[in-house]
């Protein structure tokens, strides 16, 4: 009779599991090397890891960069990776929200330029502080530029104006 014995029941991790976890730490360290210094300061990191992350851009040769990332991965073993991942997820979520809001404003700009008074009325309904006269003037200029293949200066002005309106309405200004 052959007994099958499962090592995972002992509570010890398999060699493969340990390797996967170490590779995940190296990947997290590589992700940290792409962050700006002011964002890194918000993370709970040791001084040695901060120095290693600051030195990362100096290593441009492939093997040197790989070796340095392995070193960062080694330093990551002493970190609270759950807290770091949680903060990185919050940063990603805020970036996603910002991009979503930005794309929404671009869609408004495009609809205003391509649409008529009904689109303008919908916009003013959503942004009551909007100056209709200024918007109409900018829309006419943008339509003229579009028809004559000129640079979209008025289109940029419309976007800037509706972005300022949005920020004011959200209390960011």
From Swiss-Prot:
SUPFAM superfamilies: PSPTO4464-like. It is found in: Cytoplasm. Keywords: Cytoplasm, Ribosome biogenesis, RNA-binding, rRNA-binding. Its main location: cytoplasm. GO terms for biological process: assembly of large subunit precursor of preribosome. It holds the Pfam family DarP. It comes from the Bacteria. One of its GO terms (cellular component) is cytosol. Disulfide bonds: none annotated. GO terms for molecular function: ribosome binding; rRNA binding. PANTHER family: UPF0307 PROTEIN YJGA (PTHR38101:SF1). Member of a network of 50S ribosomal subunit biogenesis factors which assembles along the 30S-50S interface, preventing incorrect 23S rRNA structures from forming. Promotes peptidyl transferase center (PTC) maturation. Belongs to the DarP family. This is Dual-action ribosomal maturation protein DarP. It comes from Pseudomonas fluorescens (strain ATCC BAA-477 / NRRL B-23932 / Pf-5).
